[in-house]
Amino acid sequence: MAANATMATSGSARKRLLKEEDMTKVEFETSEEVDVTPTFDTMGLREDLLRGIYAYGFEKPSAIQQRAIKQIIKGRDVIAQSQSGTGKTATFSVSVLQCLDIQVRETQALILAPTRELAVQIQKGLLALGDYMNVQCHACIGGTNVGEDIRKLDYGQHVVAGTPGRVFDMIRRRSLRTRAIKMLVLDEADEMLNKGFKEQIYDVYRYLPPATQVVLISATLPHEILEMTNKFMTDPIRILVKRDELTLEGIKQFFVAVEREEWKFDTLCDLYDTLTITQAVIFCNTKRKVDWLTEKMREANFTVSSMHGDMPQKERESIMKEFRSGASRVLISTDVWARGLDVPQVSLIINYDLPNNRELYIHRIGRSGRYGRKGVAINFVKNDDIRILRDIEQYYSTQIDEMPMNVADLI
């Protein structure tokens, strides 16, 4: 097991990495030498899966995808220390889809996640990437009808993504048969342990065939996780992904000086035609501000959708579905959107409010240029926000220039 490497980087190293255009030069740590595969075409993936990857909007694999997908496909047990925003979900999703025998209508891969939302998101991602493969994939989560789970599992599912409690329940009821499972993925393993799922994870593992390949993704590697990897894994390869250096790459960042809060709205209206060139997300710091801005934009006859954490899950899902499909083009949101949700078409982010802490900045704008896409981020900055903007610049060793008149040409 490789020693737990430090996540910190010096200011000068951070600066060097941020300016680095070539993702293969991102500082990476692995427990052994790992080949870098710079394109999806050179990974040896099946043709119908490649079609799904490109149709989904991915163009170039992210740094973790360039390193981990080949290792997982080869059958290696893999520990990926990585946070959301690095492309981790697509890393294991592509690998899982590559390893399936579609002719066999039995569960061949099991993915455990800490929350229902994440499990559903993983399931939807698998169905989208596997669109040309005729893949069956079910989300097995608490809070839903048990009978429906049993019916779906009886029908036959190639992949099951779910929360540990419900998955174990389905295994115990013999509705989820484990004999054909080849791969177990533990996503956000540290979060699962924080939520008290340790027992259920071990219970699930005991029912899997002895030769099951294990892929574990975790932002941190505390003692309990390392204990789990020792029990579940054989000679795992460990890949550490440092996120902050990756995600400002290829993103042009600008600010617009607004003297007072009231002027932000007029500035946004002036920019609306630019927003709808592709798709845009507008971030506000509070739910109340999201509701207020949405109403004000609609009163001015602009088409926008909005989302925040107080909305019922069903409503959030349908808003995300509309946005993903391109039916809605401008989404106003709080930071609930900024973590782990992939919409490849988003190429413009507007910070109507600068984030309350500088770590959130990368969560927000890092998504606008992911997977080799370029992006633009525009920050609305009041006079008393200048200090915060400078702090963000310094923290990320980046440069945020005044927005040029021709910003539409850059998107």
From Swiss-Prot:
A motif (DEAD box) lies at residues 187-190. It is found in: Nucleus; Nucleus speckle; Cytoplasm. InterPro entries: DEAD/DEAH_box_helicase_dom (IPR011545), Helicase_ATP-bd (IPR014001), Helicase_C-like (IPR001650), P-loop_NTPase (IPR027417), RNA-helicase_DEAD-box_CS (IPR000629), RNA_helicase_DEAD_Q_motif (IPR014014). Disulfide bonds: none annotated. The modification N-acetylalanine is found at A2. The modification N-acetylmethionine is found at M1. One of its GO terms (cellular component) is nucleus. A motif (Q motif) lies at residues 38-66. It catalyses: ATP + H2O = ADP + phosphate + H(+). It comes from the Eukaryota. Residues 69-239 form the Helicase ATP-binding domain. There is a cross-link at K19, K152, K314, K374, K382 (Glycyl lysine isopeptide (Lys-Gly) (interchain with G-Cter in SUMO2)). Keywords: Acetylation, ATP-binding, Cytoplasm, Helicase, Hydrolase, Isopeptide bond, mRNA processing, mRNA splicing, mRNA transport, Nonsense-mediated mRNA decay, Nucleotide-binding, Nucleus, Phosphoprotein, RNA-binding, rRNA processing, Spliceosome, Translation regulation, Transport, Ubl conjugation. GO terms for biological process: embryonic cranial skeleton morphogenesis; mRNA export from nucleus; mRNA splicing, via spliceosome; nuclear-transcribed mRNA catabolic process, nonsense-mediated decay; positive regulation of mRNA splicing, via spliceosome; positive regulation of transcription by RNA polymerase II; regulation of alternative mRNA splicing, via spliceosome; regulation of nuclear-transcribed mRNA catabolic process, nonsense-mediated decay. Belongs to the DEAD box helicase family. eIF4A subfamily. Identified in the spliceosome C complex. Core component of the mRNA splicing-dependent exon junction complex (EJC); the core complex contains CASC3, EIF4A3, MAGOH or MAGOHB, and RBM8A. Interacts with CASC3, MAGOH, NXF1, RBM8A and ALYREF/THOC4. Component of the ALYREF/THOC4-EJC-RNA complex; in the complex interacts with MAGOH, RBM8A and THOC4 (via the WXHD motif); these interactions are likely specific to RNA-bound EJC. May interact with NOM1. Interacts with POLDIP3. Interacts with CWC22 and PRPF19 in an RNA-independent manner. This is Eukaryotic initiation factor 4A-III. It comes from Mus musculus. The gene is Eif4a3.
